[in-house]
Amino acid sequence: MNAVVLFSVLFALACGQVSSFCIPTEYMMYVDRRECAYCLTINTTICAGYCMTRDINGKLFLPKYALSQDVCTYRDFTYRTVEIPGCPHHVAPYFSYPVALSCKCGKCNTDYSDCTHEAVKTNYCTKPQTFYLGGFSG
């Protein structure tokens, strides 16, 4: 009995190390433009989760590309565009944002991802909120 339990625990740990848990995850973002009367609340999906990484000893002898670690990033995504209500006529009221369709563990691509550890902006509204209910897409 003990051998079966031990084997099960070891097997579960091995599977957990091999598989990554990098998946599209629901995320709520707030779009707040200084010139517009309202803050827009958008429900979208982002890539979030765990990717297996290893810290390599002997970093001095390795090329720089071998030192970067995998992050949970977009495999496939699309952009959606919404209109922020209450903007004056001289202000472009449109805001585009990515929607994760599928994710992967890989190198962070700064062309379409924020590769910083923590976001610089805070995610909250300073004005009355309105919710995006769909309809306009780019």
UniProtKB/Swiss-Prot annotation:
Keywords: Disulfide bond, Glycoprotein, Hormone, Secreted, Signal
Keyword Signal: yes
GO molecular function: hormone activity
Residues bearing carbohydrate: 43
Compartments where located: Secreted
InterPro entries for the chain: Cystine-knot_cytokine (IPR029034), Glyco_hormone_CN (IPR006208), Gonadotropin_bsu (IPR001545), Gonadotropin_bsu_CS (IPR018245)
A Pfam match: Cys_knot
Superkingdom per UniProt: Eukaryota
Membrane-crossing segments per the record: none
GO terms of biological process kind: G protein-coupled receptor signaling pathway; response to calcium ion; response to estrogen; response to vitamin A
Prodomain positions: 133-138
CDD domains: GHB_like
UniProt KW Transferase keyword: no
PANTHER family for this protein: GLYCOPROTEIN HORMONE BETA CHAIN, THYROTROPIN SUBUNIT BETA
Subunit structure: Heterodimer of a common alpha chain and a unique beta chain which confers biological specificity to thyrotropin, lutropin, follitropin and gonadotropin.
This protein's name: Thyrotropin subunit beta
Gene name of this polypeptide: Tshb
